[in-house]
Design a protein with these regions (language model features):
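Conserved alpha-helix/loop element of class I SAM-dependent methyltransferases that forms part
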Residues: 39-40, 54-71
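Class I SAM-dependent methyltransferase SAM/SAH-binding core
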Residues: 76, 82-129
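N-terminal auxiliary segments of SAM/dcSAM-dependent transferases
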Residues: 1-30
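A short SAM/SAH-binding and catalytic strip from SAM-dependent methyltransferases
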Residues: 139-150
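A short acidic, Gly/Pro-enriched loop at the edge of an enzyme's catalytic core
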Residues: 128-140
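A short glycine-rich, Lys/Arg-flanked "PGG" loop and its adjoining helix->strand segment in the class I
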Residues: 153-165
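Conserved beta-strand signature within the Rossmann-like core of class I S-adenosyl-L-methionine
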Residues: 167-173
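Conserved Class I S-adenosyl-L-methionine
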Residues: 202-262
Length: 262
């Protein structure tokens, strides 16, 4: 992984700005690697329609956000991407208010065009300087996003600022052990208390394997031949560096919940 923070952020922004232009499909709503839920989670948090396109990417949001019991709460997603996750949360879990911010203008434009959900709003914004008042939200979601931020410690300080007392950050991401340790340190320094920390690597690996035929078919159909290898790496397909590093334990995909004391 690229360790220079500014370069890493610029590379991710370039990727996220380019992706919608090459894959403008209105029904391609998600960019996460997907999640294969356990039977226990299906029982505890309910099932979703497993016939839907990209349902495992939808499941990543469902089994993260459902833990927040967001009904009648105000929810912010930082790094809302193509908007499918926030739309699922808004339509299925029915928060009082759902707002997404993303630093990629093309992603926000895609959301405005394809997600006309009355309770969801999409804005262009900076995760390190969020355009919101103090204590404005009950829940902050962050899905496979903050590893790309130039200043993750500042992002977590901003999360703590915009959360109400008793509110919580619900985050999933992929990184190596040393990088997770830094995130835990920055979380504590921001004044957030780690409440849940779960390794979900196997669930993600299984989702990647099961979704391989669909991803390959889409890439073959829409991506020029000379770019397919790059897109397979970006999508985390079977055989990609990310997939192999997840399988061999070099990096971990984790779900954390961090609470602002109230």
């Amino acid at each position: 992984m690229v360790r220079q923070p500014r370069l890493r952020e610029r590379l991710w922004k370039l990727a996220y700005e380019t992706f919608p232009k090459i894959l403008p499909d209105a029904n391609w709503w998600f960019m996460n690697y997907g999640y294969e839920p356990s039977d226990a989670e299906r029982y505890q948090f309910g099932t979703i329609d497993e016939t839907q396109f990209q349902w495992r990417s939808r499941a990543m949001y469902h089994y993260l956000a459902a833990r927040a019991m967001p009904e009648a709460k105000e929810v912010l997603e930082v790094g809302s991407g193509r908007g499918g996750g926030l739309r699922h949360v808004a339509e299925t879990l029915k928060p009082k208010r759902a707002v997404g911010i993303d630093f990629a203008a093309s992603a926000v434009k895609f959301c405005h065009k394809n997600h006309r959900v009355s309770s969801a709003t999409y804005l262009e914004g900076n995760a390190m300087a969020m355009p919101f008042a103090d204590a404005e939200f009950d829940v902050v979601l962050n899905v496979e996003s903050c590893h790309a931020y130039f200043d993750q410690a500042q992002f977590l300080r901003e999360v703590a600022r915009v959360l109400r007392p008793g509110g919580a950050l619900y985050l999933v991401d992929v990184r190596a052990d040393w990088n997770w340790d830094l995130l835990y340190q920055w979380t504590a320094e921001a004044g957030l208390k780690l409440h849940e920390n779960t390794d979900i690597t196997l669930n993600v690996v299984r989702a990647i394997e099961l979704d391989e035929p669909v991803k390959n078919a889409l890439i073959k159909k829409r991506v020029p031949f000379w770019l397919r290898g790059v897109f397979k790496e970006f999508a985390g397909n079977v055989g990609s560096q990310l997939y192999e590093r997840l399988r061999n334990g070099e990096i971990q995909y984790r779900r954390i919940v961090a609470v602002k004391p109230g």
